Amino acid sequence: MEDGGVRRWVVDISKWNPSEDEFCSYLSVLPPHEHPTITRFIKCEDRKRALVSRLLQYSLVHEVFGIPFERIIINRTIEGKPYLQNTKSLAFPNFNFSASHHGDYVGIASEPVCLVGLDIISNSIPTQETALEFINNFSSYFTALEWKNITEAENSDEALAAFYRCWSLKEAFVKALGTGLGYGLQRLEFRHTNWTDISVYIDGEESRDWRFSLFEINDRHWASIAQGHPKTAVQSFRSTLLKADFEGEHHLDPFLLPDAGGFILQSVDQLVAVSKQEKLGRLAS
């Protein structure tokens, strides 16, 4: 279900293998200034992920606000948080979105009021080291409790899954906050009951300003969603929001808004269809 400015979309790129001409055709749907952010990648898979990520952003904004692709202006804060520049909507005062990719999937999530962060993970097994050796490289980013839960899992597969899920929650939080790579992930401690009823402790104190969800895309891919009160955004990102303080306005409480539930699977052709139809309409007129 989708409501208002809330969206949850994913694209499976594993079977999408466009020819060079087809790739250029899809790329042409986007404004020219976006092209270098995609073509700078050398590997084909990286280019595919970059292109689909941008297509998701533009297609989502177009669906929510009806803005033609060529008139959509997406800027970034100094920390790298993307935001929509050219709309101010009282219905969606803090419209924001977060894109992510890993493995076979590229996804996007949006919210009209509260902050949103998305992180997709592929539960892939490292090829040159064991799962436990791989996990140990990141021990400094977890609290003692988190590390205990990871390393005391029943087997290495379970340990790897616990590691990825916890890591993904941390990444989703940071992306929602808009802080960029400078935020110390070890400051965050996630507590949960079998990965439900997830709460976050920041510097040892539980925060009531956040809500978290984990979604299983398939047996190898998961998505983490972080939803935060807009007052928690870093200043550069907060300055792009219309409404950060909701005290005394319960009808605007971001956590009373309906959840979007699971993700809707989109195809690349679905993402570009509207833009192509608009171009054909202009040519015909």
Please place each PLM-identified region on the residue numbering.
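Core catalytic alpha/beta fold that binds nucleotide/phospho-ligands
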Residues: 1-285
